[in-house]
Amino acid sequence: EVRPFLDVYQRSACQTRETLVSILQEHPDEISDIFRPSCVAVLRCSGCCTDESMKCTPVGKHTADIQIMRMNPRTHSSKMEVMKFMEHTACECRPRWKQGEPEGPKEPR
């Protein structure tokens, strides 16, 4: 079955979408404990821009409180806990390169 162009185009646009993020990548100082689940679903910007010089960038953010289970392997204890995760609320296509930086990827040295 062929997916219609307009559907493909709309789904690929720069927008917030549910994304799985690792708890340890988002909270790298928490490596002594085990978390369940080990990743959580949050809204993050992703998608394509109409111009390769642009990238899908968050222009609105908020902090989401998400309940997880923290387990301590040393004491064999566990508890429910609320952790904070950044969620994107709005996205825009913005220039890839900041003003003052060379346009384009840096040359390897």
Swiss-Prot record:
Pyrrolidone carboxylic acid (Glu), modified sites: E1
Domain of life according to the entry: Eukaryota
Biological role: Snake venom VEGFs may contribute to venom dispersion and prey subjugation by inducing vascular permeability and hypotension. This protein stimulates vascular endothelial cell proliferation (EC(50)=0.2 nM) in a similar manner than VR-1 and vammin. This angiogenesis probably occurs through VEGF receptor (KDR/VEGFR-2) signaling. Also induces drastic hypotension mediated by nitric oxide (NO), which is produced by VEGF-activated endothelium NO synthase. Also induces vascular permeability.
GO terms for MF: chemoattractant activity; growth factor activity; toxin activity; vascular endothelial growth factor receptor binding
Name of the protein: Snake venom vascular endothelial growth factor toxin VR-1'
Cysteine-cysteine disulfides: C14-C56, C45-C91, C49-C93
Subunit description: Homodimer; disulfide-linked.
Other notes: The new subtype VEGF-F is proposed to group snake venom VEGFs that specifically bind to KDR/VEGFR-2.
GO terms under biological process: induction of positive chemotaxis; positive regulation of angiogenesis; positive regulation of endothelial cell proliferation; positive regulation of mast cell chemotaxis; response to hypoxia; sprouting angiogenesis; vascular endothelial growth factor receptor signaling pathway; vascular endothelial growth factor signaling pathway
Compartments, as annotated in UniProt: Secreted
Family annotation (Pfam families): PDGF
Family: Belongs to the PDGF/VEGF growth factor family. Snake venom VEGF subfamily.
One cellular component (GO) term of this entry: membrane
UniProt KW keywords: Disulfide bond, Growth factor, Pyrrolidone carboxylic acid, Secreted, Toxin
Tissue specificity field: Expressed by the venom gland.
